[in-house]
């Protein structure tokens, strides 16, 4: 069997030949087991000395067929699948799925549930950005920042554990509201974090922003034109670092985001350093949103009054036969969703996350497709690194903040 006939083999026209300077070109394989690709990403690069002449990303190593799995699950069961797509921002994926199905059901969500969703997804954004900043800094040689970022991330994970019992795969949002009543004392835990975190962001910036090594490795590196970004469908902090103020929370508000006061950070330099600046400022804005949600949290129900969709309270099940019947039917048979199709967009930490859901009127979705930001953003790799030095590849791909589960699905 020839190389071109091997199943799954990526055939790339990269051949070592004579360079213009009379030297030899070399084909370098980076990944898929490489610590700085942050997942199973493979890059095939053609080098002329230390210059990258051509780069081809090879993805798909983390493909799970998760979109097909949706078709075999009841709508309420599929929430747990969404956690596994972008595993650094599970609540963002929970929210996108729930909003899409709720739109098909024309289900009205109580204000407290909406605000709680906003607060927790912004904490998720902070969690994700902390992982990005810590690992990105570590890749470039700043180990202290990595340790400090994970120190703060630990406090956020403790908040998630308080709400859901889980640190990462939380599955805390449900179609119709939340999975559980918000726990006692959550305000004190969140306030304790908010009182400390702004000074921690200052600490990160003091270590990096004016650091000559950091600026030397990030300024003017990883440039890609705005036209190319739009052609490739790049969204999120990468696009905002190129000067476009596009954010679904502002442009297409959902879950009461229109009631919150925050800014959308942008830059115009469009390099690795600009993406760092945008994400750091996003952490400040997310902290601002979390505080507004905590202090202005509406009173009332934390899930919709829809017994055919939302599981009844445990106390009602002990005393009301009707509640017990509804619980049994939802768990064993699911609930029917009106026939139709919907596309719901939210702003995940990595960019525009869209859920396209088709219902045929049964208890399981007919088709689900996710427009994940990591897949689009990863298309920028060749444009970003070709013509640059091999030493700058790690900084460039680190600035994209992609998640391979989000890319491969």
Swiss-Prot record:
Top EC class, one word: translocase
Membrane-protein topology: Peripheral membrane protein
One Gene Ontology cellular component: plasma membrane
Subcellular location: Cell inner membrane
Name of one Pfam family that matches: Complex1_49kDa
GO molecular function, one term: quinone binding
UniProt KW Ribonucleoprotein keyword: no
Superkingdom: Bacteria
Catalytic reactions on record: a quinone + NADH + 5 H(+)(in) = a quinol + NAD(+) + 4 H(+)(out)
Keywords: Cell inner membrane, Cell membrane, Membrane, NAD, Quinone, Translocase, Transport, Ubiquinone
EC number assigned by the record: 7.1.1.-
PANTHER family the UniProt entry points to: NADH DEHYDROGENASE [UBIQUINONE] IRON-SULFUR PROTEIN 2, MITOCHONDRIAL, NADH-UBIQUINONE OXIDOREDUCTASE 49 KDA SUBUNIT
Family, as annotated: Belongs to the complex I 49 kDa subunit family.
Assembly and oligomerization: NDH-1 is composed of 14 different subunits. Subunits NuoB, C, D, E, F, and G constitute the peripheral sector of the complex.
Cited function: NDH-1 shuttles electrons from NADH, via FMN and iron-sulfur (Fe-S) centers, to quinones in the respiratory chain. The immediate electron acceptor for the enzyme in this species is believed to be ubiquinone. Couples the redox reaction to proton translocation (for every two electrons transferred, four hydrogen ions are translocated across the cytoplasmic membrane), and thus conserves the redox energy in a proton gradient.
Designated name of the protein: NADH-quinone oxidoreductase subunit D 1
Organism: Solibacter usitatus (strain Ellin6076)
Phylogenetic classification of the source organism: Bacteria, Pseudomonadati, Acidobacteriota, Terriglobia, Bryobacterales
Gene: nuoD1
């Amino acid at each position: 069997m020839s190389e071109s006939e091997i199943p799954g083999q990526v055939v790339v026209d990269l051949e070592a030949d004579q360079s213009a300077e009379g030297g030899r070109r070399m084909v370098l394989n980076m990944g898929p087991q490489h610590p700085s690709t942050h997942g199973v990403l493979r890059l095939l690069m053609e080098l002329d000395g230390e210059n990258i002449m051509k780069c081809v990303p090879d993805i798909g190593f983390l493909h799970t067929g998760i979109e097909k799995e949706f078709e075999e699950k009841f709508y309420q069961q599929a929430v747990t699948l969404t956690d596994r797509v972008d595993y650094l921002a599970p609540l963002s994926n929970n929210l996108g799925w729930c909003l899409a199905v709720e739109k098909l059901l024309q289900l009205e969500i109580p204000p407290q549930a909406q605000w709680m969703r906003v607060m927790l997804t912004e904490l998720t954004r902070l969690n994700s950005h902390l992982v990005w900043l810590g690992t990105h800094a570590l890749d470039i040689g700043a180990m202290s920042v990595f340790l400090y970022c994970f120190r703060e991330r630990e406090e956020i994970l403790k908040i998630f554990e308080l709400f859901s019992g889980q640190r990462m795969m939380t599955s805390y949002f449900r179609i119709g509201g939340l999975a559980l009543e918000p726990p006692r004392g959550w305000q004190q835990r969140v306030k304790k974090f908010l009182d400390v975190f702004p000074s921690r962001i200052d600490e990160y910036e003091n270590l990096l922003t004016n650091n000559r090594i950091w600026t030397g490795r990030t300024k003017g590196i990883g440039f890609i034109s705005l036209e190319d970004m739009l052609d490739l469908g790049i969204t999120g902090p990468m696009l905002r670092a190129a000067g476009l103020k596009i954010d679904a929370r502002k442009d297409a508000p959902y879950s009461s985001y229109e009631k919150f006061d925050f800014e959308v950070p942008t830059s115009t330099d469009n390099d690795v350093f600009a993406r760092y600046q945008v994400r750091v400022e996003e952490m400040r804005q997310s902290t601002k949103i979390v505080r507004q949600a905590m202090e202005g949290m509406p009173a009332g129900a934390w899930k919709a009054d829809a017994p055919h969709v939302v599981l009844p309270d445990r106390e009602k099940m002990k005393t009301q036969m009707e509640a017990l019947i509804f619980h049994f039917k939802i768990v064993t048979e699911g609930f029917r969703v009106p026939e139709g199709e919907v596309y719901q967009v939210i702003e995940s930490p990595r960019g525009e996350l869209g859920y396209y859901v088709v219902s045929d009127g049964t208890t399981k979705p007919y088709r689900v497709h996710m427009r994940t930001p990591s897949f689009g953003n990863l298309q920028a790799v060749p444009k970003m690194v070709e013509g640059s030095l091999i030493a700058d590849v790690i900084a460039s791909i680190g600035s994209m903040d992609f998640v391979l589960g989000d890319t491969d699905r």
